[in-house]
Amino acid sequence: MMCSGYYNYDTPYTPEFAGQQDFQGQVVHPQHWPEELDYQDKQVVVIGSGATAMTLVPSMAEKAGHVTMLQRSPTYVASRPDQDAVANTLRKFLPGSVAYAITRFKNTQMQKFLYGKMRAEPEKMKKVLVGMVRKALGPKYDVEKHFTPKYNPWDQRMCLIPNGDLFKSITAGDTTVVTDHIDHFTT
């Protein structure tokens, strides 16, 4: 087993950006989210495209005026249902612990299979993953720029989004993805 960590929960890494001291908006680190944060009808920028951003962006877009997800480079993103139909069916007929064990086995085997497939046939699986995003966002969306990484699937961690909510937020016009570097903050 190998485990690694790269941050301290109490003092998360927060990069500094030119112009940040003059920025008049509020800067929030999601690790220490203020409960009273009011972003209703505001223009929000989420910096990053990791797992936190992938769930934060569509959720915030429900209340914000608009949310922009700013990323330096794309991440592989796959949508999957937030409910497991097999697990839900098994729980109707089996004790919870048995249903859990079967579901856990099914999910770990599926993950092993998909991981192996992506490592064995990276170009083919890259086309599948990018094709799913293209199908969700439509032919006019620049999937190459915003959702096609330069690396192979699982060279870096992939992000799963529940029920395609990020894609729905983008197609609804509530969210924009920008792939670029931050030069400086403006007021």
List each model region and its residues:
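A conserved short coil-to-beta-strand element within the FAD-binding core of flavoproteins
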Residues: W33-E36, H146-Y151, M158, T175-T187
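Short histidine/acidic/glycine/proline-rich micro-motifs that form metal-
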Residues: R119-A120, P153-Q156
